[in-house]
């Protein structure tokens, strides 16, 4: 880097690690806090699909891989099946993924006319709020309007033991978007976009700065993914 401020660096007391990995599938992601980064956003789109196929909960572009509404609906229905009460908001989330006529009587979907702080159980919903089904149906049968892709993903999460309504342990972000954040474990893709590669070839220091930010996000372990094209990547 041509123009930089001198800095003094001090090591931490504990050991860390830096590993070069062929593919993200080769990393054990089922425990701990993770930050997965790349220089360009499009590089991360296949990563999100891989995490879904592995049954892992994550945040990407500031959004959970399972929306709060879907989490509320699935969790709400299972709470009702256990004989517990849920909030009006959760009940509305449940109803929003049920078909009119087979799951909920017509005219009851919005659950109008109830106090906002009311707690509702299965019996009340059946007797007073048009619910046509009961605890004989598990969530993926009761919530018949849930998109199939989400149904498969939630099933994969549950099989892996992930708590789909918890705060995600894994964040997927561009390096720029992760500035200021950090994690015990960082996974870094070194591929460059065409624009970044061109800037790098003419001696632009910005690419150095970007990857300096990336590697310094790791608190314990840094995993460097081998690039698809060595001629268009940042070597670490």
What does each model-found stretch correspond to?
Residues 1-236:
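The feature marks helicase ATPase cores and/or their adjacent C-terminal helical subdomains
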């Amino acid at each position: 880097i041509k123009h930089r401020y001198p800095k003094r660096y001090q090591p931490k007391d504990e050991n860390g690690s830096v590993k070069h990995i062929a593919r993200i599938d080769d990393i054990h992601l089922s425990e701990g806090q993770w930050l997965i980064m790349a220089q360009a956003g499009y590089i991360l789109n296949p990563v999100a699909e891989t995490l879904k196929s592995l049954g892992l909960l994550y945040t990407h572009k500031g959004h959970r891989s399972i929306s709060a509404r879907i989490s509320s609906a699935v969790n709400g229905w299972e709470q009702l099946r256990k004989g517990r009460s849920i909030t009006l908001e959760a009940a509305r989330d449940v109803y929003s993924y049920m078909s009119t006529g087979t799951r909920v009587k017509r005219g009851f979907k919005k659950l109008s006319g109830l106090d906002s702080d009311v707690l509702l159980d299965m019996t009340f919903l059946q007797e007073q709020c048009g619910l046509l089904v009961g605890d004989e149906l598990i969530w993926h049968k009761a919530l018949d309007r849930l998109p199939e892709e989400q149904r498969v993903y939630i099933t994969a999460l549950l099989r892996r033991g992930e708590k789909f309504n918890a705060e995600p342990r894994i964040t997927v972000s561009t390096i720029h978007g992760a500035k200021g954040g950090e994690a015990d474990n960082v996974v870094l893709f070194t591929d460059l976009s065409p624009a970044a590669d061109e800037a790098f070839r003419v001696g632009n220091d910005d690419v150095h700065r970007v990857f300096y930010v990336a590697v310094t996000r790791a608190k314990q372990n840094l995993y460097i993914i081998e690039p698809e094209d060595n001629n268009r990547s940042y070597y670490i």
